[in-house]
Swiss-Prot record:
GO terms for molecular function: G protein-coupled receptor activity; odorant binding; olfactory receptor activity. Residues 1-26, 80-100, 165-205, 261-271 are extracellular. It is a multi-pass membrane protein. CDD domains: 7tmA_OR5D-like (cd15410). This is Olfactory receptor-like protein COR5. Glycans are attached at N5. The chain crosses the membrane at residues 27-49, 58-79, 101-120, 140-164, 206-226, 240-260, 272-292. PROSITE patterns: G_PROTEIN_RECEP_F1_1 (PS00237), G_PROTEIN_RECEP_F1_2 (PS50262). The gene is COR5.
Amino acid sequence: MALGNCTTPTTFILSGLTDNPRLQMPLFMVFLAIYTITLLANLGLIALISVDFHLQTPMYIFLQNLSFTDAAYSTVITPKMLATFLEERRTISYVGCILQYFSFVLLTSSECLLLAVMAYDRYVAICKPLLYPAIMTKAVCWRLVEGLYSLAFLNSLVHTSGLLKLSFCSSNVVNHFFCDNSPLFQISSSSTTLNELLVFIFGSWFAMSSIITTPISYVFIILTVVRIRSKDGKYKAFSTCTSHLMAVSLFHGTVIFMYLRPVKLFSLDTDKIASLFYTVVIPMLNPLIYSWRNKEVKDALRRVIATNVWIH
């Protein structure tokens, strides 16, 4: 971990979102509220799916894992970001930075693959309804979940191993509110060409796995739905897909902007805003998107509330 007289720093300094002291406390309160809503919404959805047997279906198994990923995602990033609003010296240990980066890549990759699997699930449910119970069994669903987490883990391991080989001799100030690759590459004393290539190749594969799977699935879904004669049937089929399309668009639109482009094409301040959206805001929006117009989730919530009221 040394290069000549250069030794790896024991800590990094995070620049945070802003240096304006007047904005520190208002931003702290805003993002604390967002983080609280994120945890309550995602953990609440996980609990609801767990206790209501009507939601023990493949679609909700994947949604439960998406909620877990979003809650973990937000927890990896937000608490440290909140601390930067309150601390004068915004430090994170070298080990803490590496662990944060590893967790961040793991969860980002997991979400990409989860969205792809959810698109395939909707395709089978709508285009092959009679075969759906046989194809998407609980065992198959959990194997898919285990497989995507394993792939995400390997992806994160590759990127983190590359990061561990970099030296940071000239600066330890990370111009960001968390340890992401772009600001770390900016202050590296070593060549980051291989790292940037790995980010592009692996990032493209994980993003495209979802970006390609989703449109292909929805082409077949649309072709199937237009043949449905009843308006109620068409509405029910499309209503289960709308939430997924919104989640995919929000997540991948930001990720493509962030990672599938040359690192120096935009300023780090622009990256901060984009990062803020998909690491803090999207994890809050996802459970709301999937629950807002979802009759099954609303009915399950009513049953749970009614049961608790009756018991008490």
